[in-house]
């Protein structure tokens, strides 16, 4: 039997992710037995979904502070709906920890998406202003990969 569930970020809040939003999502999520996460949205949605691939019963803050073992137990398919965040190809998730009024980042290989699917039609529905700013963001990320002191063989090969 195929079991599926759809959770909407708007149910948990809007804007940039917070630990409170992720904890509410985790509470609902842990009531099921999911093998795969499909995150369709911008960077905030994908960043929140990255935490869902991890094992355990911890609160969001414990994951971001690395107070618990970080073990990936689910696959993540990321489908971005903007063109600038890059969350679908990074191992980083950022959230605000409300108790300290500050953002924390988690950068570990366990939260890389297993697959990223780019669907150009999803960008057609973006308001022009949002499309333009996210496209500029994507362009800046591309430049950054060339000038970064952490450039790698992939980006170095593209310079010639």
Q: What are these regions, as identified by a protein language model?
A:
Residues 1-2, 160:
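Short, small-residue-biased leader/transition segments that mark boundaries at the very start
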Residues 4-6, 75:
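Conserved beta-strand segments of alpha/beta enzyme cores
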Residues 95-159:
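Carboxylate- and glycine-rich phosphate/diphosphate-binding segment that chelates Mg2+/Mn2+
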Residues 6-19:
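Short beta->alpha junction loops
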Residues 20-27, 31-120:
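Glycine/threonine-rich beta-strand-loop-alpha-helix active-site module
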């Amino acid at each position: 039997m195929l079991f599926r569930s759809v959770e909407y970020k708007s149910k948990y809040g809007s804007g940039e992710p917070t630990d409170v939003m992720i904890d509410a999502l985790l509470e609902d999520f842990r009531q099921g037995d999911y093998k795969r996460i499909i995150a369709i949205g911008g960077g905030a949605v994908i960043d929140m979904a990255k935490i869902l691939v991890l094992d355990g019963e911890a609160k969001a803050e414990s994951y971001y502070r690395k107070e618990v073992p970080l073990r990936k137990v689910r696959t993540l398919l990321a489908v971005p709906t903007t063109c600038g965040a890059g969350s679908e190809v990074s191992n980083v998730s950022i959230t605000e920890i409300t108790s300290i009024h500050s953002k924390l980042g988690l950068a570990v290989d366990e939260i890389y998406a297993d697959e990223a699917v780019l669907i150009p039609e999803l960008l057609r529905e973006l308001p022009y202003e949002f499309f333009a700013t996210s496209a500029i963001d994507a362009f800046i990320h591309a430049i950054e990969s060339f000038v970064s002191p952490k450039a790698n063989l992939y980006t170095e090969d593209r310079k010639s």
